[in-house]
A protein has these predicted regions:
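Glycine-rich segments within core transmembrane alpha-helices of 12-TM secondary carriers
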Residues: 1-13, 209-223
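Helix-loop-helix hairpin linking two adjacent transmembrane segments in secondary transporters
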Residues: 1-48
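Extracytoplasmic gate region of multi-pass secondary transporters
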Residues: 4-9, 13, 66-131
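Helix-to-loop junctions at the C-terminal end of transmembrane segments
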Residues: 12, 137-152, 230
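Flexible cytoplasmic inter-helical loops of multi-pass small-molecule transporters
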Residues: 18, 46-65
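Multi-pass alpha-helical transporter architecture, strongest
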Residues: 39-46, 242-266
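C-terminal transmembrane helical hairpin of 12-TM major facilitator-type secondary transporters
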Residues: 150-193
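Intracellular juxtamembrane helix-capping segments at the cytosolic ends
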Residues: 187-205
Length: 266
């Protein structure tokens, strides 16, 4: 995801502007991506992962309760919904926000440059913003691997606060560069939410882990709603970022209150 915006700009579109691109120019590239995904999927389906003792029911054993009876899991699924949703909202639409402002006469610079040319291909600043957003998430995940001594509730709460503040700052200043920082703060969210959602679920853990994946649908719905909001606003993206703020605030709520275990399986 870090290199994908540059890949699309330079390899798929060849540095052309959006107005110059037509569907025939991207068919071969995306067919190639489909082949890669198919190969990776085949490899993953043939991998045998070890079972972790105590995380699922014994063979033939029937679970007495529904996983939905655990409130911290149910709210965790919603947390994943908002997390994946706001993550994709920023990653997918920050470039459209920047392009809108550029078309209105705004100029964005990167170390004094209004574009970045590599190998004769002009990589626009909006694509660079998306790359830096995903890159910040990558760096954050590398750093967060050394934060095991900090409780996941604390990591999640701090990250949600700063992500919300950065997004509000982008709205107030009408500046997409502030959204780039959100990627760094998003880096710890998946692991923190997942850890909190399956806490003390014992033999329900395996089923709960699969249940949590329902929440990833937020990655398709929230960006869609944001795009519809932008269309309703006449193509203006500025105020649509409140969708991201709402998502960050729910994640903060989950970190502080929603993740508390009211009923445990162990």
């Amino acid at each position: 995801t870090t290199l994908a915006p540059f890949f699309v700009t330079g390899i798929v579109f060849g540095g052309l502007s959006m107005e110059e691109v037509n569907i025939s120019q991207i068919q071969v590239s995306f067919l190639g991506l489909m082949v890669v995904f198919a190969v990776v999927t085949l490899i993953l389906t043939r991998m045998k992962l070890p079972d972790i003792k105590g995380t699922k029911a014994e063979s033939g054993e029937k679970l007495e309760k529904s996983v939905w009876s655990f409130s911290h899991l149910m709210m965790g699924v919603l947390g994943i919904f908002f997390y994946v949703g706001v993550e994709v909202c920023v990653g997918a639409n920050i470039n459209l926000y920047a392009i809108e402002l550029q078309n209105a006469g705004r100029q964005f610079l990167f170390f004094g440059m209004d574009s970045l040319t590599i190998g004769g291909v002009n990589f626009a600043i909006p694509a660079l913003m998306a790359t830096l957003y995903w890159g910040g998430m990558l760096i954050g995940r590398l750093i967060s691997s050394s934060l095991n001594s900090i409780p996941p509730q604390t990591q999640l709460a701090v990250a949600a606060i700063f992500a919300a503040l950065s997004t509000v700052g982008a709205i107030v200043a009408d500046n997409p560069w502030l959204l780039v920082a959100v990627g760094f703060f998003h880096s710890v969210m998946w692991g923190s939410i997942f850890t909190l959602a399956i806490s003390r679920l014992g033999k329900y853990t395996s089923v709960a882990s699969g249940t949590i994946m329902i929440g990833v649908i937020g990655g398709s719905l929230l960006p869609l709603f944001q795009g519809m909001f932008a269309d309703a606003m006449g193509g203006m993206w500025r105020w649509t970022w409140f969708i991201v703020v709402i998502g960050e605030l729910y994640i903060l709520y989950y970190a502080l209150l929603g993740s508390k275990v009211k009923q445990a399986a162990d």
